[in-house]
């Protein structure tokens, strides 16, 4: 991906030199032409087309933002209730992510959502130990993480 971005920027600057007009609009036009060339050369350049990865990163950010808002609402409900009836619990989350950076990213995203914190990762990197402030059932918690955060983290790391 980094090579594709670099090639795109070099071709954009080359476009400025060829046209002789050094303004922002001309750079954007050159960037778009270079983007087309990078797309055509995607078989030669390593990795998948970088705009797909950028799209997946934006999707990851939006999914995390939605999960963050939902978790904040849940924690607010717990805090403003007059009686305390939440059930905090520890549970083990089994992940099938293989790359270390994906596991770390997933762990950080889980920790950043209010009401959950990652306590550790097993040595074989298949289990994440989590504390939840309001635990319903393990199946619900696991499905919530697997269907949202882990899914988009896996998509970002596919076909690098």
From Swiss-Prot:
Gene Ontology terms describing biological process: proton transmembrane transport; sodium ion transport
Keyword Transmembrane helix recorded: yes
Keyword Zinc-finger in annotation: no
Localisation per UniProt entry: Cell membrane
Keywords attached to this entry: Antiport, Cell membrane, Hydrogen ion transport, Ion transport, Membrane, Sodium, Sodium transport, Transmembrane, Transmembrane helix, Transport
Principal location class: membrane
GO MF terms, alphabetically ordered: antiporter activity; monoatomic cation transmembrane transporter activity
Transmembrane segments: 1-21, 27-47, 49-69, 101-121
Membrane topology summary: Multi-pass membrane protein
A GO CC term attached to the entry: plasma membrane
Superkingdom in the source lineage: Bacteria
Its biological purpose: Mnh complex is a Na(+)/H(+) antiporter involved in Na(+) excretion.
Oligomeric and partner information: May form a heterooligomeric complex that consists of seven subunits: mnhA1, mnhB1, mnhC1, mnhD1, mnhE1, mnhF1 and mnhG1.
Protein family: Belongs to the CPA3 antiporters (TC 2.A.63) subunit E family.
Name this polypeptide is given: Na(+)/H(+) antiporter subunit E1
Originating organism: Staphylococcus saprophyticus subsp. saprophyticus (strain ATCC 15305 / DSM 20229 / NCIMB 8711 / NCTC 7292 / S-41)
């Amino acid at each position: 991906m980094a090579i594709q971005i670099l090639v795109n920027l070099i071709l954009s600057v080359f476009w400025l030199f060829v046209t002789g007009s050094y303004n922002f609009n001309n750079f954007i036009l050159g960037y778009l032409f270079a983007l087309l060339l990078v797309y055509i050369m995607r078989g030669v350049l390593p990795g998948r087309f970088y705009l797909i990865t950028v799209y997946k990163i934006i999707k990851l950010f939006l999914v995390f933002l939605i999960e963050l808002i939902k978790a904040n609402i849940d924690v607010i409900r717990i805090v403003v209730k007059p009686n305390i009836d939440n059930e905090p619990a520890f549970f083990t989350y089994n992940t099938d992510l293989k790359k270390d950076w994906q596991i770390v990213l997933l762990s950080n995203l889980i920790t950043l959502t209010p009401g959950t914190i990652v306590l550790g990762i097993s040595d074989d990197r298949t289990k994440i130990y989590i504390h939840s402030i309001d635990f319903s059932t393990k199946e619900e918690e696991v499905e919530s993480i697997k269907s949202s955060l882990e899914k988009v983290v896996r998509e970002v790391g596919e076909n690098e």
